[in-house]
Amino acid sequence: GSEMCIRDRKEYAERGYIHAVALDLSKYFDTLNHEILLNILRRNVRDERVIQWIKRYLKSGVMENGVVMETEEGSPQGGNLSPLLANIYLNEFDQEYQKRGVVFVRYADDIVLLAKSERAAKRLLETSTKYLEGPLKLKVNQEKSRVVSVFAIRTFKFLGFTLGKNGKGIYVRVHGKSWKKMKSKLKELSSRRSVQSIRPALAKIKVYMCGWLNYYGIAEMKNRIEELNKWLYHRIRMCIWKQWKKPRTKVKNLRKMGVPEDLAWQAGNSRRGYWFTTQTVAVNMAMTKERLISSGFYDLAIAYQSVHVNC
């Protein structure tokens, strides 16, 4: 799986394989050669009926402008069988480069070859391109395929991750684009405009972040997650504060939650904005972490600690 690929990449970097060849295949699913794929299958599948069934599947065509067009190459994207066939096709690459003694990591059509020197990596880029475009008849995107350092966070990303290095050694981290995408989604889910009811909103956030952390939990990001957690608590408090609307309602609800009358009145009648007011003592006394968690808040710091320990 993806987690094993990331672990492998980290271990290889620790052994000195710090130069990567990031290969980008142009329209991979659309360019699988049917004849090559069927010949690969025939080497392992003796029942010709199965081969013919797969052949019909491959030639079932694609939809273009509402019309089904037969195809001579490619595998129907979205088909249940397509990912398996695509993986079988690139297994030829795996076998060849294992014979050559090359260190590499592949997940689906994401291929990264590793070398200990930049010179060796450049040779690998050249030879791997020839093999993919020759015997396998695929197309390598020359503009996107490159030799980079495994620590180059701006130019090197594999399955949403990259590697970092500090005094303690090499560690896995979330790539900047992956983090930015996640935070943008959280902003959307915790927007004061979109949140009509708190519990359903918290449930959506939990579903999204549970999946995200299960995938990215292998990365080292304790401090970043704690900061993100504080930020999310604050945004949820703003959503609740907005829903209370009138000053009288705000004061009443704060008092119900145990806030002293003077602090409740001061916060409830404040003319300051949501961001400022929800940082006051009164609001934080009322909307404690424990109270929000009991309402369904998914504490990111607690969740991360749990999944990271188990990685």
Predicted regions and their residues:
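Short hinge/gating elements
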Residues: 70-76, 188-192, 215
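Non-catalytic, peripheral interaction segments enriched in hydrophobic/basic residues
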Residues: 201-247, 251-255
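Conserved polymerase palm-domain catalytic core
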Residues: 7-155
